[in-house]
């Protein structure tokens, strides 16, 4: 069987799908063959066109079947619930505080057979049945790349959970393939989980720990005091706003990391490709790394700080108290400090690039310079391989 024969057969078996779904599916498998190194091996991996078509049709039929379906339920106050476990395939989950005395849930566009909720030993376990079958690598790849939002109704599958406002849950666990999670004004001691493709949002509420990962999706945390957070996204932005924390760890393979009006004893932020920004950010110890991107901080206050970028600029305006290490392999450094230069011990290494202090060129021997006073309690080390260095202090204002 050739590639063209395979696609023709597959197309005929998919005749029951909506035209747009059918077209998008065939286009995907055309690209699949184009990317394959060996046509025969790709066909063997996919299996028979008929079997593959059955799996794809089942995926779409489940979505069609749940359209416009609504289910709701209230749990009795006598049913004690301390934890919630959510095993989700593709639904958007919203968890809100309510004025009611009972925990309740509502679903939208999820068929009855695809949803279950029960209490087990104080745990509310909610499951959304998988809407697809992972039997072959090719079909898994299809699901990872297929435009679900425009081609089926999984984007409209929704679960709304209302929690009485005075309730304090010990833990919430969220495990999802293509679903998102938003929690607002609900008190949950520990929140943890992952989503392969979807966003994660937590706003307000009383929390101790958040540990969450998304392979492809944005993370947004706001308006809370918390002990520790560990957040990661392979491809997506991470944003903190109005936060007071003990420890923050944030990493993204490709995306920005933003801190707005945030205070934390310790911060470790890493972006493989994307900017890291801070506005009114305060930390006792902060480490900020970008592989390719700008580090930009305004109105910030650090006791100890390490700012690194492989390819990109570093811009800092604010207070540095004890120690700062600023490194840019390819990119400029712009440092704006509030005190006089003699209140800092500044050590500069610049392989290629000019150094300016308050608008004036600084000349020195070789590639190393010292500015300020060696007796200062604030030590700042600046290093660039290719990039200009600009320093502004109180005298230059």
Regions picked out by a protein language model, each given a short descriptive name:
Residues 21-25, 52:
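Residue-level detector of well-ordered alpha-helical segments, enriched
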Residues 2-19:
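Amphipathic, heptad-repeat alpha-helical segments
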Residues 25-40:
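Amphipathic alpha-helical segments that form the core helices of the histone-fold
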Residues 12, 47-50, 134, 155:
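A composition-biased, non-transmembrane "mature-region" signal
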Residues 129, 151-153, 157-158, 162-167, ...:
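Short, surface-exposed interaction patches in beta-rich subdomains
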Residues 23, 64-129, 135, 149-194, ...:
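Short linear S-[DN]-x-LW-Φ motif typified by the pepsin-like aspartic protease active-site region
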Residues 37-68:
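Short, charged early-sequence alpha-helical segments and their helix-coil boundaries
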